[in-house]
Curated annotation (Swiss-Prot):
Subunit structure and binding partners: Forms oligomers.
Lineage start: Bacteria, Pseudomonadati, Pseudomonadota, Betaproteobacteria, Burkholderiales
PROSITE patterns in the record: SPOVT_ABRB (PS51740)
Taxonomy, superkingdom: Bacteria
Protein name, as recorded: Transcriptional regulator MraZ
Family, similarity comment: Belongs to the MraZ family.
Entry keywords, A to Z: Cytoplasm, DNA-binding, Repeat, Transcription, Transcription regulation
Source species of the chain: Ralstonia pickettii (strain 12J)
Length: 142
């Protein structure tokens, strides 16, 4: 299970260094193989390959009215491997789709990660906090 936020920097080639606390889990769970694709909220999702296979099967089973989302998720997916330095290459197309230039946030979301442009993430987080909690969380005990 992946959790926590990490402020990271993309290098000139578009590579992102996976924090050491997650590298071992990715090596054990997926032999360093991951898949990156678009997320509907404007960020990217980074899956260990076995989790991606489960997600891909769920997407492929969606009804015909979701065909554009199948294209978005599956058509933009990129299979990559952690290099010897623990970095993942984000393709130029995916970097452009998520407006990733230099400063990024990597968020552990349980079974996968989200990769956000740092400024976009901060703005969206502040907007969510300003709106208050949704009804689904009103009775949640902290």
């Amino acid at each position: 299970m992946f959790q926590g936020a990490s402020a990271l920097t993309l290098d000139a080639k578009g590579r992102m260094s996976i924090p050491s606390r997650h590298r071992e889990a990715l090596q054990l769970q997926a032999e360093g193989r991951v898949t990156v694709t678009k997320h509907p909220d404007g960020c990217l999702m980074l899956f260990p390959r076995p989790e991606w296979e489960r997600f891909r099967e769920r997407i492929a089973a969606l009804p015909m009215e979701a065909h554009w989302w199948k294209r978005i998720f599956l058509g933009s997916a990129a299979d990559v491997e952690l290099d010897t330095a623990g970095r993942v290459l984000i393709t130029p197309e995916l970097r452009a789709a998520a407006s990733l230039e230099r400063d990024v946030m990597l968020l552990g979301m349980g079974s996968h990660f989200e990769v956000w442009d740092a400024a976009t993430y901060t703005a969206k987080e502040q907007a969510a906090m300003a709106q208050g909690m949704p009804d689904a969380l009103k009775n949640f005990s902290f």
